[in-house]
């Protein structure tokens, strides 16, 4: 194989790898309607006392609207997932299971207008919370 061909293949491979990495970062969060429904039930039972029944905030910060947008919009969904998993509930941090953090994240995303997808939210979910 000539040096020119070898360099061309290496360049094409590098460009393709960059495309894949960019595409993975650009994808939006994915969760199912079932996860959001389950998260809504858990939220009502365990989270609403601090964050309000409508996610409007009370003792804890609002999880919907401008306050949510300013903190989470455009960022990786895994950051929101990790925050919920590690710091909630405030009186028992790091007590949630991964599945609980996933359904709560799904519910919060749905309440903020992020549409459900066909893939269930995974642990350390890929993608971003879309900007408005």
Kindly label every feature range from the protein language model:
Residues 2-12:
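Bacterial N-terminal signal peptides that target proteins for export
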Residues 13-14, 24:
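Cleavable N-terminal signal peptides
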Residues 22-42, 92:
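Electrostatic cytochrome c docking/interface patches
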Residues 36, 56-89:
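Gly/Gly-Pro-rich "capping" loops immediately C-terminal to redox-active cysteine motifs
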Residues 39, 43-53, 104, 108:
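The canonical Cys-X-X-Cys-His
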Residues 91-132:
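Flexible coil segments in periplasmic/lumen-exposed cytochrome c-class electron-transfer proteins
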């Amino acid at each position: 194989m000539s040096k020119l061909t070898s360099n061309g293949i290496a360049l094409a491979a590098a460009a393709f790898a960059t495309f894949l990495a960019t595409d993975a970062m650009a994808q939006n969060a994915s969760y199912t309607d079932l996860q959001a429904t389950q998260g809504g039930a858990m939220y009502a039972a365990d989270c609403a006392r601090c964050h309000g029944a409508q996610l409007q905030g009370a003792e804890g910060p609002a999880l919907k609207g401008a306050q949510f947008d300013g903190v989470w919009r455009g960022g990786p969904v895994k950051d929101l997932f990790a925050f919920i998993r590690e710091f909630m509930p405030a009186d028992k941090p790091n007590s949630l299971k991964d599945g609980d953090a996933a359904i709560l994240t799904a519910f919060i995303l749905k309440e903020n207008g992020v549409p459900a997808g066909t893939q269930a939210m995974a642990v350390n979910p890929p993608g971003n919370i879309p900007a408005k």
